Amino acid sequence: MTKADQIFKANIQKIINEGSLSEQARPKYKDGRTAHSKYITGAFAEYDLAKGEFPITTLRPIPIKSAIKELFWIYQDQSNSLDVLEAKYNVHYWNEWEVDQTRTIGQRYGAVVKKHDIISKILKQLAENPWNRRNVISLWDYEAFEETKGLLPCAFQIMFDVRRVGEDLYLDASLTQRSNDILVAHHINAMQYVALQMMFAKHFGWKIGKFFYFVNNLHIYDNQFDQAQELLKRQPVASQPKLVLNVPDGTNFFDIKPDDFELQNYDPVKPQLHFDLAI
């Protein structure tokens, strides 16, 4: 059993046994019903990527390709356009969060990255002083929230630090997320930001180090408990999945493509489970 599978099962069981029930919930199911959830707060996990510990479960298939394409839309294209997401990456699930028939998700995610020129600033800071302690990407922009409607960012902050081990430099990353649907999105979000960590590391020719993941509200929606029980029953496969970025060290951040990523040794338990999403 992988470390990710151990953490996944432990968190599911903890939510079932110890979780609190949501009140005044905002999300809705497609039929209009309020999407309540059971949740825990303050969930934390640590993965040593350098030792092959990657935050992806083998208990069900995780759609990593579309997740990485979404990441590129946010941090390379720096876009909030649904047309760009569909035409360039053939990703459609963000249509559920279109704002007022604008074909955008409002001033969120990529729009905030572009507004503050965040990626260029982080690359410059790391180039000038890899050991600086100010490498913070934050998507939490109150001014943008007031400017337009839109889903507030779930995974909203990632920080980077560099460590020297012998002759090698390792890039660590810490992801903070305000809210996470553990059964559907937990490993999608984690692997997205591992991919981002790898892109920064490749840009500088560094090795990937540790990945820290903090979720403030980790929940299971009230229409997902059958799937949760099924996941607890499943026996994980023996393989150790690994995400690889197949470009030379020193490849510019903006020259990396989604197809440069390869998920190796991934043979998840099937069949896939169906989830009715809360919007």
UniProtKB/Swiss-Prot annotation:
Function of the molecule: Catalyzes the reductive methylation of 2'-deoxyuridine-5'-monophosphate (dUMP) to 2'-deoxythymidine-5'-monophosphate (dTMP) while utilizing 5,10-methylenetetrahydrofolate (mTHF) as the methyl donor and reductant in the reaction, yielding dihydrofolate (DHF) as a by-product. This enzymatic reaction provides an intracellular de novo source of dTMP, an essential precursor for DNA biosynthesis.
EC number: 2.1.1.45
GO molecular function: thymidylate synthase activity
Enzyme class: transferase
Localization terms from the record: Cytoplasm
Protein name: Thymidylate synthase
A GO cellular component annotation in the UniProt record: cytosol
Pfam families with a match to the protein in the record: Thymidylat_synt
Species assigned in the record: Streptococcus pyogenes serotype M12 (strain MGAS2096)
Residues the entry annotates as binding (6R)-5,10-methylene-5,6,7,8-tetrahydrofolate: 181, 278
